[in-house]
């Protein structure tokens, strides 16, 4: 009984330490953007597929970038390999990599470890891109996926999709996790307003106050 209690206390302390030591430095817009959407995703995750159209539409509506990190969960049997293929297509062009992720989400129920390669070949043919017999001979793209996953671990990601609206504002919290996706647009509105407001405050000259002598 005592050993079990000690184990529980140790686990709680470890979780608390992890929570306080999370690194959120990755939660920021790319250079040149004031506001962006950051998403940690798994290509085999049904909820990621459900969220994808909303995220794309929000990015288009507000003309803001989406920064995606591959976070393939160990319980899924083809998401890591699909993410590696995605990094290969990213190396050809970012829009092509984004289109591959869209393809995976749209065809998710029919994809399996056995037919992932044939799906990648079909996608490549549709987009007039060559798919080499060995996609990642040196493990470079697998390394990129692992690096994305490591970023997620440092942030403290526990599930997919995890979505943030991030900004470059100088004051207050520069990122907000979108827990309720129905509030995505209102969170973006608020973040854009706060970002523009903080910039205006920072640029507004401070008037000198003259104190009258008695």
Indicate residue ranges for each PLM-predicted region.
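Structural alpha/beta surface segment adjacent to cysteine/selenocysteine redox centers
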Residues: 38, 43, 49-125
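Extracellular/periplasmic catalytic domains that process cell-envelope and extracellular macromolecules
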Residues: 29-31, 59-61, 78, 154-159
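A short beta-strand-turn-helix
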Residues: 20-35
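Positively charged n-region of N-terminal signal peptides that target proteins for export
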Residues: 1-5
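Bacterial N-terminal signal peptides
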Residues: 6-17
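Catalytic His-Asp charge-relay segment
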Residues: 36-38, 162-163
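C-terminal cap of thioredoxin/glutaredoxin-like
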Residues: 121-214
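Domain-level signature for proteins that mediate thiol-based redox and metal-cofactor handling
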Residues: 9, 20, 65-67
């Amino acid at each position: 009984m005592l050993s079990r209690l000690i184990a529980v206390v140790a686990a709680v302390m470890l979780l608390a330490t992890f929570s306080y030591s999370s690194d959120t430095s990755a939660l920021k817009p790319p250079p040149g953007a004031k506001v962006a959407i950051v998403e940690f995703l798994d290509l085999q995750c049904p909820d990621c597929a459900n969220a994808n159209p909303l995220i794309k539409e929000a990015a288009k509506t507000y003309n803001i970038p989406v920064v995606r990190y591959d976070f393939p969960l160990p319980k899924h049997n083809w998401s890591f390999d699909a993410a590696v293929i995605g990094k290969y297509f990213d190396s050809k062009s970012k829009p092509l990599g984004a289109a591959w992720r869209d393809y995976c989400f749209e065809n998710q129920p029919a994809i399996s470890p056995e037919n992932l390669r044939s799906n990648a070949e079909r996608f490549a043919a549709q987009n007039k891109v060559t798919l080499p017999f060995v996609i990642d001979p040196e493990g470079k793209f697998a390394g990129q996926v692992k690096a994305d996953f490591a970023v997620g671990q440092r942030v403290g990601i526990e599930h997919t999709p995890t979505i943030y609206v991030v900004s470059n504002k100088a004051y207050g919290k520069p990122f907000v996790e979108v827990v309720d996706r129905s509030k995505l647009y209102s969170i973006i509105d608020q973040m854009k307003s706060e970002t523009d407001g903080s910039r205006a405050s920072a640029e507004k000259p401070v008037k000198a106050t003259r104190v009258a002598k008695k």
